[in-house]
Amino acid sequence: MATLSRLPMVETNIVTYCNRTDGRHIETVFDTANGPLHIHNFYVPAGGDEPDPKINEKFAHKLAFLDEMEANFRAIRRKKKAKRQILVGDLNIAPGEHDVWSSKQLKNVVSHTAVEIEALARVQASLDWEDVSRRFVPASEKLYSWWSYRARDWAASDRGRRLDHIWVTPALLDDVTGFEILRDARGWERPSDHAPVVLDVG
């Protein structure tokens, strides 16, 4: 993962989680006319295949990572530095019923289990994050950013999940002017299984 910018970066930090230096959280600070803007770029651990932290170390690590995410943002909130923040990245959790092709069939599948959804909700509450995508696309509508390589025809089967997210703090909501998931990119030659997610901020 990386953060690329045409604008100068004032500060860049790689935040450590679970005593691992694998660069899963890059924080970048920009100077803007309205004050500092912090962008948090995340790649949350996928969690393996078995949604049981007692027998799956990868899943236990994912839950611990989410706990530390929450603690990190609560610390930012206590320091009163939370005004202009954007969170982006592959969070490897599809929290809503219509963020997956079948909530019933995936409820015990890693990325859509209750324990992950609850942990992500705590992260979101830690800084009053707003899930921008669902301000543009109602929660009652299907919305995906990822389709498995295993599907013979990903577009026809459309068994996707919304694993990639953009959140903003309340102070930035009025500046958000557009949102889009570039679904067609999934059909390019040798594509990623994730489609680009775009946010326009005025």
Outline where the language-model segments fall.
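A residue-level structural signature of the nucleotidyltransferase/glycosyltransferase Rossmann-like core
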Residues: 1, 84-86, 160
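Structured beta-strand-rich core segments of catalytic domains in phosphoester-bond hydrolases
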Residues: 1-52
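Metal-dependent phosphoester-hydrolase catalytic domains
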Residues: 12-15, 96-202
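Soluble or luminal CAZymes and related metallo-dependent hydrolases
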Residues: 20-22, 60-69, 112-116, 159
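Alpha-helix C-cap/termination motif
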Residues: 31-33, 75-79, 126
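Active-site beta-strand/loop signature of hydrolases that rely on acidic residues for catalysis
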Residues: 39, 69, 73-97, 132, ...
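Catalytic metal-binding/acid-base residues of hydrolase active sites
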Residues: 43-45, 92-94, 136-138
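Surface-exposed cleft-lining segments at the edges of enzyme active sites
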Residues: 44-67, 104-109
